Design a protein with these regions (language model features):
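Alpha-helical solenoid repeat scaffolds of the TPR/TPR-like class and their adjacent stem/linker regions
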Residues: 1-387, 392-453
């Protein structure tokens, strides 16, 4: 499973604001070694191979790179083959390609990044760090190596180090797609007494996870009179954040440009823990968001009319950037069918298909997501149910931010924020993490979840 940064690097099609899903999933890969195969770079065959990679046709791209490599043993072409194989889920072949590149060019930093990425995909993060460190030692400007190193540090729970290294995300290929803000304002240094603009970045899951740091920024700015903290917010989160305790001034995305002169400095949302000097053992606790309780009460009363079963909110589909996080509604309903007399399922999924809606109705489920216009609606539904079962999507982050009891269903390797081999999370105390073994299918994990409710 690869992160959205890889999609931005390779396909240039990243949509920073997704539907409820979204940070870093397991560490990102470097782009193909474009430019490493200097003898071939100008050839039409090389451009075609790069285009195939960018289009996501990794099998055809590998064939094209291998064809080029037959005429000259160019280590950059071998690196490109390795990334194709990594994207195709063939890490053993990828390792051989990266090692072959290093045999010809021991100082090729990108090949070391590739070896680190393979280790990280198998949750061998200490090994990954050693490979990334070699890449950085060979080429200090390796922003991709530093960014991927940050992801492994996150997986190991070394958050303070990870936050520092994660600043390299702005110097990676594809950064302009992931981080579209190019504000003519200096970066905030974490000091007080400034008119600060914090701006969102990445997907909704990442945003929700890091909203907890906004009240701390408000407090820091207020330490010296005259300062103010403002947050540029994606519209689907606007109403929910206006109810957030200790929130900054909320500005809808797209409305801030004319007011840029009102601010002295800016900061990306995911840089706040670094700028604020936060510690891993003192993360802001949950809940830090509040649902519209009257709206939640109305939903709860409607759903419980003449029905005493407990309500379980469900979300089964994650972002299209990482389809391996998703399962099918049919599998979820089948696993919970033996408890149908005790539990009633409430879909928290937006835009379900007609087939899914019919299947949900057949099992006496509730399609709450049909009425979702914003995350405030989702939050009210989360507050109305008794518990939640969700794959790794923004719904799970929102449930955690609201401190709702949640079973989080994870495939492996899971996103680094969830850390390997643990059942709890320092980010959300109300979440229990259930992990799908590599040899299991979702049904095994779903049956376990059904017994835990």
């Amino acid at each position: 499973m690869f992160s959205r940064l890889l999609a931005a690097i390779t396909r240039k099609t990243y949509r920073a604001i997704e539907e409820p899903q979204a940070n870093p999933a397991p560490p990102t890969q470097a782009p193909p070694g474009q430019g490493q195969e200097n003898a071939h770079a100008a050839r039409p065959e090389a451009q075609r191979a790069h285009a195939l990679f960018d289009a996501g046709d990794y099998s055809a791209a590998r064939d094209a790179y291998e064809h080029l490599a037959q005429t000259q043993a160019a280590p950059g072409l071998m690196v490109n083959c390795g990334y194709c194989e990594l994207m195709l889920g063939e890490p053993d072949k990828a390792r051989k390609s990266f090692e072959a590149a290093l045999a010809l060019a021991p100082h090729l930093a990108q090949a070391w990044v590739g070896l680190g990425d393979i280790a990280a995909r198998h949750n061998r993060h200490e090994e990954a760090l050693r490979a990334y460190d070699k890449a950085i030692a060979l080429e200090d400007s390796q922003g991709i190596a530093r960014n991927n190193r940050a992801q492994s540090l996150l997986a190991l729970g070394r958050l303070e180090e990870a936050w520092r290294e994660n600043e390299a995300r702005f110097s990676t290929p594809g950064a302009t797609a992931l981080y579209p803000h190019r504000l003519a304002l200096p970066r905030w240094d974490g000091g007080a007494g400034r008119r600060l603009l914090v701006h969102w970045e990445q997907g909704f899951g990442d945003i929700i996870q890091h909203l907890r740091f906004l009240p701390l920024a408000v407090q820091r700015i207020a330490q010296v009179g005259g300062g103010s903290c403002n947050f540029e917010c994606p519209p689907p989160l606007l109403t929910l954040l206006q109810r957030m305790p200790g929130a900054p001034t909320i500005i809808a995305a797209g409305e801030m440009a004319p007011e840029l002169s009102s601010f002295d400095c800016q900061a990306p949302l995911l840089s706040l823990p670094l700028l604020l000097g936060c510690r891993a053992d003192a993360l802001p606790s949950t809940p830090y968001l509040r649902a519209d309780q009257p709206a939640a009460d109305v939903l709860g009363q409607a759903w419980r009319q003449r029905d005493t079963r407990r309500l379980v909110g469900i979300a089964w589909r994650a972002s299209s950037f990482d389809p391996q996080r998703s399962l099918t509604l049919a599998a979820l309903l089948a696993a919970f069918a033996p408890r149908a007399t005790e539990l009633r399922l409430v879909s928290l999924q937006k835009d379900i298909s007609a087939e899914e809606r019919a299947l949900l109705t057949l099992h006496e489920g509730i399609d709450a997501g049909a009425n979702f216009d914003s995350f405030d609606d989702t939050a009210a539904a989360l507050a109305a149910v008794d518990s939640v079962v969700s794959v790794d999507t923004a719904v799970a982050h929102l449930a955690g931010a609201l401190a709702r009891p949640t079973l989080l269903l994870l495939n492996e390797p899971a996103a680094v924020r969830w850390m390997p081999d643990v059942e709890d999370s320092p980010w959300y105390g109300s979440l229990r993490l259930l992990r799908k073994n590599a040899n299991d299918d979702w049904e095994v994990l779903l049956r376990r979840a059904a017994t835990l409710l």
